[in-house]
Amino acid sequence: MERNTCMILALDVTEREEALKIAENVREFVDAIKVGYPLILATGLDIIRELARFAPVIADFKVADIPNTNRLICEQVFKAGADAVIVQGFTGRDSLDACIEVASKYGKDVFVVSEMSHPGGAEFLQSAAEAIAKMAVEAGAFGLVAPATRPERVKEIRKIIGDRLTIISPGVGAQGGKASDVISAGADWVIVGRSIYKAESPKEAACEIAEEIQAELRGK
């Protein structure tokens, strides 16, 4: 996945036409589009290929099952046209290996959740985040998911992985995270959803956040 704008759109809407319209409007400001269960369950897997006309698609299914089931899920995701999948790390190395094995077959990427962005994400996952990060490096994942709502945690994860993996960071905007703060902490991409797709002008909102990111990068 190429790093140009350093922003990923989290497209958590449930209407096909709305999703396509937003994706087309903001395409110049995002490096990828992240889709999850709300949109996929409402419209079907075919929406992935439709959105891929505008930007690479990350399937945020937080895959968390036994190796064989993980393998089957990832097969469907990549056959549908996704460029990457997000998986949970707490299920262990064998389950992660199954996802990476399928991704390698298709020439695609795997992002591993180290810690989620909501307050509850600090209750159980935080204590395992560093071990998950180390495992992701050893397994050969492409990147980690770390919370924009807690930039200090992004900084800690970056210390562990160095430049061996990328970091995508959700929670910018509606959840309280600030794009420039998390880029400064070491994230490669920020993930923004409601602040863009619920804005009166998604294009203007995306442009504004993209400019904030670029200003931070210029200041580094």
Curated annotation (Swiss-Prot):
Keyword Ion transport: no
Active site: K62 (proton donor)
Keywords on record: Decarboxylase, Lyase, Pyrimidine biosynthesis
Disulphide-bonded residues: none
EC number: 4.1.1.23
Primary role: Catalyzes the decarboxylation of orotidine 5'-monophosphate (OMP) to uridine 5'-monophosphate (UMP).
Matching NCBIfam families: PRK13813.1 (NF010386), pyrF (TIGR01740)
Record-linked PANTHER family: OROTIDINE 5'-PHOSPHATE DECARBOXYLASE
Protein name: Orotidine 5'-phosphate decarboxylase
Species: Methanosarcina mazei (strain ATCC BAA-159 / DSM 3647 / Goe1 / Go1 / JCM 11833 / OCM 88)
Organism lineage: Archaea, Methanobacteriati, Methanobacteriota, Stenosarchaea group, Methanomicrobia
